[in-house]
Regions:
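GNAT-family acyltransferases
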Residues: 1-81, 86-89, 102-106, 110, ...
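Conserved GNAT acetyl-CoA-binding A-motif
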Residues: 110-119
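Conserved active-site tyrosine of GNAT-family acetyltransferases
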Residues: 131
Length: 155
């Protein structure tokens, strides 16, 4: 299963691939986050797409992964949160804006999903710009990392 954009293929990693990502991750916080994602996949096999690491692969350069994202589980209330990151060298090309728009629209087309949310570090202006460009607005709440956003769609 994959989501296709103009320039990328977006797809969830298999459990074995996620284990490799965890083994190769040097940042302790990311290693912990990826481990929790894998545990979510293993605990919720029928809903693993809502816990998996998703890669962002360039169409015109097969095998080149420019970043990744995840959904942070699907709540009983129909709310799913997204998180994302780009590799150095691939920023400022619009890849994340393209991916966030596509995954948000895809998520909202899935059974049980009523709302897509995100949270960013208060100082991560680039990430906030991605959210604003793709139809998110601040919902007035603060999370552990910073301001929270909710998808409102394009006007």
């Amino acid at each position: 299963m994959r989501v296709e954009t103009e320039r990328m293929y977006l797809y969830p990693l298999r459990d074995e691939e996620m284990r490799l990502v965890i083994e190769n991750e040097s940042d302790p916080e990311m290693k912990q986050a990826y481990t929790e994602m894998l545990e979510g996949c293993l605990s919720n096999p029928d809903k693993r797409i809502w816990y998996a690491i998703w890669d962002m692969e360039l169409k015109d350069e097969p095998g080149i992964i420019v970043g990744d994202f995840c959904f942070k589980g699907l709540g009983d209330d129909g709310v799913v949160e997204i998180g994302y990151g780009l590799k150095e060298g691939y920023r400022h090309y619009g890849y994340m804006t393209e991916a966030v728009k596509a995954i948000t629209e895809w998520a909202l087309s899935q059974d049980g999903v009523k709302q897509v949310e995100a949270e960013t570090d208060a100082e991560n202006i680039a990430s906030q710009k991605v959210l604003f460009r793709t139809g998110f607005i601040r919902n007035g709440k603060m999370g552990e990392e910073g301001p929270r956003f909710v998808y409102e769609g394009r006007r």
